[in-house]
Amino acid sequence: MRIGKSSGWLNESVSLEYEHVSPPTRPRDTRRRPRAASDGGLAHLHRRLAVGYAEDTPRTGARSPAPRRPLPVAPASAPPAPSLVPEPPMPVSLPVVSSPRFSAGSSAAITDPFSSLPPTPVLYAMARELKALSDATWQPAVPLPAEPPTDARRGNTVFDEASASSPVIASACPQAFASPPRAPRSARARRARTGGDAWPAPTFLSRPSSSRIGRDVFGKLVALGYSREQIRKLKQESLSEIAKYHTTLTGQGFTHADICRISRRRQSLRVVARNYPELAAALPELTRAHIVDIARQRSGDLALQALLPVATALTAAPLRLSASQIATVAQYGERPAIQALYRLRRKLTRAPLHLTPQQVVAIASHDGGKPALEAVWAKLPVLRGVPYALSTAQVVAIACISGQQALEAIEAHMPTLRQAPHSLSPERVAAIACIGGRSAVEAVRQGLPVKAIRRIRREKAPVAGPPPASLGPTPQELVAVLHFFRAHQQPRQAFVDALAAFQTTRPALLRLLSSVGVTEIEALGGTIPDATERWQRLLGRLGFRPATGAAAPSPDSLQGFAQSLERTLGSPGMAGQSACSPHRKRPAETAIAPRSIRRRPNNAGQPSEPWPDQLAWLQRRKRTARSHIRADSAASVPANLHLGTRAQFTPDRLRAEPGPIMQAHTSPASVSFGSHVAFEPGLPDPGTPTSADLASFEAEPFGVGPLDFHLDWLLQILEA
């Protein structure tokens, strides 16, 4: 046997295949025997486990081991050679096993082949693997007893008296590794996962499956009177407890529904079944409904157990609580609140606190009742004095709603909140603590601004008086912001100064400027465009592309700007944008005949169907009473107000009054007040709107619903 220098493993020249091993008297062959085709995984494991030392073989860095007896060999054609160490007697039952490798006359079934090796964890794991593989490869000639059960937790084989007395099972387990130390998880042998190396499934000594238990208990619960709906809603782990304590609980007066509610905390079933007589004796007024409400909570069993020793003391002086009050504290405050209430009952009711039993119950009857009671006991005298000046009712309210943390925040920050710049009264500080707790108090302390939220209510009928406030900035605010940017000496610093001057945030100021046609880049740079450009941008948002050839006078002259605006809105380019196709000159028969056919009513007297573009418009906007306005009154509306209200002319009206509109080949979608429409003489100037026009403008401008502002504020913005 020689030791390889590269790999560090022992290279054995002696195989454990006993029919191929030479007698020990022959000179040792140092050449490695090639693996035979008949060698399986068993022979490979035998070679790995044969780590003994041959005689007179020195070992580097260690003392020479004791001479180990060689492995005896029994050739098929020669009698077995004598061994140096006497062999142990063979078991009597070995002839029952017939295998070509482990025959009755072979010495391969020796019980202890590695008696001289120390029982290390690694060798023990390998021995277990060898033993399991040997069990899988043996072919018994007679039926063997059942496979010994295996411990499910450790994987160790459990032998009873019958299996220990069996010579076959006893010979399969090496005695040298009967009780070795357990191998670490990293050193355990890995089980092969291939299909050809299938391992026998172990038999575990465990309880039946949970589904089997559920089916068995289901039948018991049905026999006890529970409905299938009740059983379906129960937890799986509570079924056996219900079946166990059902008789006791029903004998105490609890119904099936009460037991199902108690089972939400399955530990409470046992507590109620055992301690109900004591609870009834300590609190005679405590009803079963109170017990059910307490027991079904998250830690209801603990609350009931904590209530037993202190129930009598809580009903006595100084608190003199009723059974319902005690049940409320136990249900919501649970065991910590009950224990704190019992411990502090005298301190809370005596001087200097003088709390009433109702106040004590209110503080303790919520999650976190114990720390709230302790905080009130410690901080109430301090919060009553200067500079806090809080009343007892305010402190109790804060403790009931927000708890201990809010009281600590008030004690830490209220002196600062009472001073400038906050200057808050004690009532406001108490209200803030009740609403938001500690977080709200700390936010106000850090300077959280309080913003007024204006809610806009849209009324169905117009009400005489000032116009309602719009959702967003007022016209005065818009004018002030624009004037601030125009009057600023350093445009690049204007945006930063505006944030501080108007006390607003960056997104809010950007939204405000965007509502009047200023982009974000322009706002950050402080370059506010003139009114004409901003108006063109607002028209673009509404879907109207400005004409390219429109003249734009100086914004200093408001009258000139209004005239330019009229020319822009009444230009043929603006009118052509709303039409489906540009106007083309066609013969009279091709331009009028199709329209006359569509305007002609059918034989049944039904009105003709509307135009396709009007159908699309009617799908976007509901028809109102103003859609039946006369054509002449609609023509008198200024173009700068009613551009885009394309439902002012109906097919019926156009049939009744054919005129120059039809010859001009126009449609309701392309109505514009330019060269295509001839106004009747005597009508007012389109540039001077009347009061009725202004009212209609406030009601339905641009076909997008009522707006919240008038024309006056728009003129103020244009002047800025």
UniProtKB/Swiss-Prot annotation:
Pfam families: TAL_effector (PF03377)
Motif (Nuclear localization signal 2): 455-458
Name this protein carries in UniProt: TAL effector protein Rip19
Matching InterPro entries: TAL_effector_rpt
Keywords: Host nucleus, Repeat, Secreted
Motif (Nuclear localization signal 1): 185-191
Keyword Cell membrane listed: no
Factors inducing expression: By hrpB.
Residue stretches of each Cryptic repeat - repeat: 286-320
Motif Nuclear localization signal 4 per UniProt: ranges: 620-623
Keyword Secreted appears in the UniProt entry: yes
Family: Belongs to the transcription activator-like effector (TALE) family. RipTAL/RTL subfamily.
Tree of life domain: Bacteria
Core repeat-type repeats, residues: 355-389
Cryptic repeat repeat intervals: 321-354
Chain positions of motif Nuclear localization signal 3: 583-586
